[in-house]
Amino acid sequence: MNMLLVIAVNTILSLILITVAFWLPQLNIYTEKANPYECGFDPMSSARLPFSMKFFLVAITFLLFDLEIALLLPIPWAIQTPHINMVLPTALILLTILALGLAYEWLQKGLEWTE
């Protein structure tokens, strides 16, 4: 009962906040807010330079494998618990998913910087 109440309250509160954010847009938009700020000077060139999509993909891959380390780091302490039958299969499933993701990234040549 408490779980359903928490889910219902969170859902209703989220819907109210989304509705308020949608129906009350910011009305004082003017061009100075849309321009980049460079120490009080007018920008010499465009501040919105395009970036390399390859760099973006490598950065996302790095973040995913950094998250892997954060998830696998507590495993030596978790092995000492009496619930080892739950810890090891979960860790192996996580490692398998990440290894398959790495293999897919490698086969798609996402890790090669030069082409």
Curated annotation (Swiss-Prot):
Q: What class of enzyme is it?
A: translocase
The catalysed reaction is: a ubiquinone + NADH + 5 H(+)(in) = a ubiquinol + NAD(+) + 4 H(+)(out)
What is any one of the record's Gene Ontology cellular component terms?
NADH dehydrogenase complex
Q: List the subcellular locations.
A: Mitochondrion inner membrane
> Sorted alphabetically, which keywords does the UniProt record give?
Electron transport, Membrane, Mitochondrion, Mitochondrion inner membrane, NAD, Respiratory chain, Translocase, Transmembrane, Transmembrane helix, Transport, Ubiquinone
Q: Which stretches are transmembrane?
A: 4-24, 55-75, 84-104
Any single biological process term in GO: mitochondrial electron transport, NADH to ubiquinone
Q: How does it sit in the membrane?
A: Multi-pass membrane protein
Tell me which EC number(s) this protein carries: 7.1.1.2
Give the UniProt family note: Belongs to the complex I subunit 3 family.
Assembly with partners or alone? Core subunit of respiratory chain NADH dehydrogenase (Complex I) which is composed of 45 different subunits. Interacts with TMEM186. Interacts with TMEM242.
Summarizing the function annotation, the protein's role is: Core subunit of the mitochondrial membrane respiratory chain NADH dehydrogenase (Complex I) which catalyzes electron transfer from NADH through the respiratory chain, using ubiquinone as an electron acceptor. Essential for the catalytic activity of complex I.
Q: Please give the PANTHER family that the UniProt record associates with this protein.
A: NADH-UBIQUINONE OXIDOREDUCTASE CHAIN 3
Q: What is this protein called?
A: NADH-ubiquinone oxidoreductase chain 3
List the lineage, top down: Eukaryota, Metazoa, Chordata, Craniata, Vertebrata
